[in-house]
Amino acid sequence: MKKISILIMPALMAGMAFTSCSDYLDVDKYFYDQMTLDSAFSKRQYVEGWMSNAFEPIDQLAESDGITRFLSDDIVKYDGHDLQNGNYSASTNNGRSEELLYKGYECIRKASTLINNVDRCPELTSSEKEDMKGQMRFVRAYAYWALLRHFGPVPLVPEEGMNVSLSYEELSLPRVPIDETVNFLDNDLKIAARSLPLRRTVNNMGHPTRGAALALRARLLLWAASPLMNGNKDLFNVKDKEGRQLVPQEYDEAKWAKAAAAAKEVMNLDMYSLYTIEPSPTTPDYERPPYNAEYSDKKFPDGWADVDPYLSYKSIFDGTIQGSKNPELIFTRTKTGGNQINYWVKESMPRTLSGNNSIGVSQKQVDAYLMDNGQTVAEAKQSGYYREDGFTTSASALNEGGAPFLPAGVSWQYAHREPRFYASIAYCGSIWKCTSASEKGYRNQQIFYYRDLNDGKQGFKEDCPLTGIGFKKFVNDEDAFTTGGYIIDKTEPTFRYAEILCIYAEALNELTSGKEYSIEGYNNEPVLVQRDAAEMRAAMKPIRMRAGVPDFSDMTYNDSELMRAAIKRERQVEFVGENSFRYYDLRRWKDALIEENQPFMGCNINISNDESRVQQFYRPTVVASMPKVFIQKMYLWPFTTTELKRNTNLTQNPGW
């Protein structure tokens, strides 16, 4: 029987725990029914089964299903106290983090084995084999990527596998320098892009394309260029057993150029565009962005005349448009991605409507949204456009006391916000439509989070949005968990085009003005990039026009510091709740030490709807049960003590 050089966990053994480091870097002779390696790659159906099995761990690697999604400064869940408080260590590490390591290397093993052995199958054509290899290179790179941004430097498994006759110590792999790993993955994704098709059929939507490989490459290279891993002397002590430094200590601007070039190659495919919906003839004027002489009369992407900003953004996430028809979608996990999105729906839905009522949005996140005229909240306070006190008295903006998108009884501080706010935030008093519910009493419910109400804090129990501000980005108007209701199928936006545009602008902004870089592309052709305000505008303006907010000023585009701050804010708003972006962004920017040490603020959920006190509910209040703690060592997660005992060549991250 021929030995398999890299472990492939069979479906029948998937639930078994590892007992040694060699369990996931070593050998297992089984595949499903204990086939030999020769048998496993002898027939098309076996190879296709193997490949399907190799995709499975990706479901556990996605950021929408991980411990990090509620651990930043934007969104909180009432049962996440320990991790928010920093109560984890190498000896008490959350099991989800250990599972990430387990699933990551399971993915790597399975993908590598197919790459090395698919040529044995006589029933596959050469093009089919190359496609499968390309898919597995994507899977392998995705797994490494998930490990890298969580733990930092990790062991790199030899492509050719490992000889099981080696001693236990010889099978224990050390961590590899970041640059070495990133260069390997960069090259691997270039190879994948050359062998993958531009499109997939609807039935194969969950299989990566050329664009998916290039998008992952852009995301990886942006991370490698960012301050956390580019000349970060705070991580000088991340070393292997031999004392070799694993995190680059010298800043290299060319890494930003590589990230920009990678994003540009996705754009140059001319395969993707931002999804937009035209305004309905019945859309009232007051639900359109305020008139702006520069944008209101121009068509997208120069303006928003032919765009409904609210529906254009909302429909990407709530299942209105199928993934296969969305020009913005680059890649999605089809197996469980939709299930994970509907998990968010269940957690977001109020208790009154049979949801778990558990997700709260921070005041910081609410304040990140602009006013509908493009002003920040701070600017609008000075101009008088923003009101903190009082409540709407009409459900129609045509009447005095009414405001666009708001029903009656809502705090004025939520009035006149940009459309993405209303598509994402369930402010106190928002309407949950739940139109599929069979009982009328469960449809079009206005939900308040005041104390002692059904969806607010009751007694000492805090099973409610801890900030008094809910989240509804992924909720479709038809979604209902009550009798007769149903949940609309949704597509997880694992990679979408708006991210690529933001990557391109962010990377260009970090380049020295006037300095041009020539970067070798995936097809070996040079890609030229330099800091260019017009190029950055071409990337960012469409996102702003789709959102119905004015573009950044010329001053912002021409000033790298202003542009950096603008891009950070744009990512915070555009990608809220997606792929744990905020959590990992704050870390790669090295902003977490400041941003995540600020008190987690929200409304005062101890205030009832008593008329004499209700205004106090909206005074920004520290969420006392969720104190935020962030110290330097938390930029990287620890390996568990158990894992360090298993792999004697594995070194711990500093401070743990």
State where each predicted segment sits.
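Long, intrinsically disordered, low-complexity segments
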Residues: C21, G104-C107, F184-D186, A260, ...
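Conserved, well-structured interaction surfaces
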Residues: S39-Q60, G80-F151, Y168-R210, V410, ...
